[in-house]
């Protein structure tokens, strides 16, 4: 009966809850804020009176976002930092500096993404490791640094941005798919730990979105078929922001993505692949075992695997 009661309560909250919480004076750290979705989210947070802390890689920077927010908000309420989030030491120093110069971070938005597009056999182990550091371990490092101050006050919100690669794997995107699906498990685990610990004032939100009209889409659009057009940044950001403000644990934009786990569960694997190939370009090389052995000399003790060019960026 308790399960039924909780389900009814959750359904009622999902349908009827429209009261958005006040985030004025919350200190919000947003990674990958230099452009794309991170920039759009930063603007929305600033419009609601939050103290916005921008963070992006040195090669991208935050000058454009800083200028946009400064025209909305007082300059003293926006702070900009650069950091290689794939570097554990830099992440640690970043958080310590923010806590000293700005204050305790009460909202964390894990948005930064490094997109690497390579076949699993054409990607070096170092490339795969760097992708995991930037896309998965960066969120882990940030949460480990920031969560203790949230727990002391029983107040905070951890948000993680996920793309479509969090709900289904795509050929030639093994590194980012591994990282993003790992983030789903990380967020669910953290939420469970907070519940077990009685921290009812700390919330988590995982946001899955369809691909967006950003520079990453321009880099990777040859991989996708235009069955479902990309979402605009403004639309996606507003939907995700609303979910954050009503403390929703999981949000999909568009809602069609809620059906993907269900469809994967009931359809034969080959049937789901047919659906997947209507969304993405199915021209992924498929080799027989003999062809693989010949192409990559897998029986040899030393392998030389040719590397393709990869597209990398620091924000969505």
Q: Where do the protein language model's features map onto the residues?
A:
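SDR active-site lid
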Residues: 193-257
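Conserved glycine-rich Rossmann-like NAD(P)H-binding loop of the short-chain dehydrogenase/reductase
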Residues: 48-64
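The beta1-alpha1 cofactor-binding region of Rossmann-like NAD(H)/NADP(H)-dependent oxidoreductases
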Residues: 59-60, 81-93, 125
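Substrate-binding pocket helix/loop in short-chain dehydrogenase/reductase
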Residues: 119-120, 127-129
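Canonical Rossmann dinucleotide-binding motif of NAD(H)/NADP(H)-dependent dehydrogenases/reductases
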Residues: 13-53
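Non-catalytic terminal and boundary segments that flank Rossmann-like NAD(P)-dependent oxidoreductase
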Residues: 1-25, 274-316
């Amino acid at each position: 009966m308790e399960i039924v009661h909780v389900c009814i309560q959750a359904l009622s909250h999902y349908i009827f809850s429209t009261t958005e919480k006040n985030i004025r004076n919350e200190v919000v750290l947003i990674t990958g804020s230099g452009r794309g979705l991170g920039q759009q989210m930063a603007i929305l947070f600033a419009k609601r009176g939050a103290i916005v802390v921008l963070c992006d890689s040195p090669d991208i920077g935050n000058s454009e976002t800083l200028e946009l927010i400064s025209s909305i908000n007082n300059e003293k309420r926006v702070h900009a930092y650069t950091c290689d989030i794939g570097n554990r030491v830099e992440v640690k120093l970043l958080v310590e500096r923010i806590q000293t110069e700005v204050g305790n971070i009460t909202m964390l938005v894990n948005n930064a993404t490094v997109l690497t597009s390579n076949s699993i056999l054409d990607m070096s182990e170092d490339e795969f490791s760097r992708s995991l550091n930037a896309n998965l371990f960066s969120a882990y490092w940030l949460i480990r640094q920031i969560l203790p101050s949230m727990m002391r006050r029983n107040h905070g919100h951890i948000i993680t941005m996920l793309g479509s690669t969090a709900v289904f794997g795509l050929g030639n995107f093994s590194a980012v798919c591994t990282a993003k699906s790992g983030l789903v498990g990380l967020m669910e685990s953290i939420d469970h730990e907070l519940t077990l610990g009685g921290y009812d004032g700390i919330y988590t939100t995982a946001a899955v979105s369809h691909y967006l009209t950003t520079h990453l889409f321009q880099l990777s659009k040859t991989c996708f078929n235009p069955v479902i057009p990309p979402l605009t940044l403004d639309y996606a950001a507003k939907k995700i922001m609303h979910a954050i403000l009503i403390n929703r644990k999981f949000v999909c934009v568009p809602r069609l993505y809620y059906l993907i786990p269900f469809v994967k569960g009931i359809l034969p694997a080959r049937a789901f692949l047919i659906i997947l190939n209507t969304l993405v370009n199915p021209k992924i090389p498929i080799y027989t075992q003999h062809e693989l052995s010949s192409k990559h000399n897998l029986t040899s003790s030393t392998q030389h695997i040719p590397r393709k060019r990869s597209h990398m960026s620091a924000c969505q």
